Amino acid sequence: MAALAVSPPPQQARSRATRRRLLRACVACLVERGLAGTTTSEVCRRAGVSQGALFKHYPNKDALLAAAVEDLFASLVADYRRGLASVSESEDRVRAAVRLLWQIMTRPTLQAVFELMGAGRCDPALRRALEAVQIRHRENLSAAARELFPQVPGDASEFDAMLDVVISAMQGASLGALVLSDPASDARRLEALTALARRVLGEAAKKKS
């Protein structure tokens, strides 16, 4: 007989649900109103909880923002995995991987996060809170990339450098697109990044064989 799934205690389930509402409300507020308009009172209003409930889970606004960003990063990595898993064997996997990453990088939710990171330049407390999240996110991205491209050996430092270049280039281009949209330049940039990824992956496969 199969074991029955054990449900979390009601209080624990309610706490998780409250945190989920707060994090989603925080991200939505960042997208719609920017950092200046993302106040704890507005987040609570959207989430349908009291400020007391918010501060029970997150000691301050910076902690809330960092948690919201980390939760968003996790969902975006999951989206990327699902998207690349749907690529057929007949398709160009490297090209699809680069273009899918660009689609995610230009989502309004992630562009709002870039704005938040920029604000950390003049806010040491916010910068420290986001720094830890960013480090974990980069580690998760690297792990996901290696799973999606198993031909890469474990000690392929050039692959890690390529991944960093691709992500950094896309982040910069995504920020620039907020002010000046240039689809032709975007297309050329994606072709260059695809060529770089293809070369590095090809060399990594040779080293592993």
Predicted regions and their residues:
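Helix-turn-helix
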Residues: T18-R21, C29-A63, A67
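Residues in soluble alpha-helical coiled-coils and helical-bundle/repeat scaffolds
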Residues: P59-A63, A67, A85-S88, R121, ...
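Short, basic, alpha-helical segments at the C-terminal edge of helix-turn-helix-like DNA-binding modules
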Residues: E70-S75
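Hydrophobic/aromatic-rich alpha-helical bundle segments in the mid-to-C-terminal region
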Residues: R127-E131, L148-V200, A204-S209
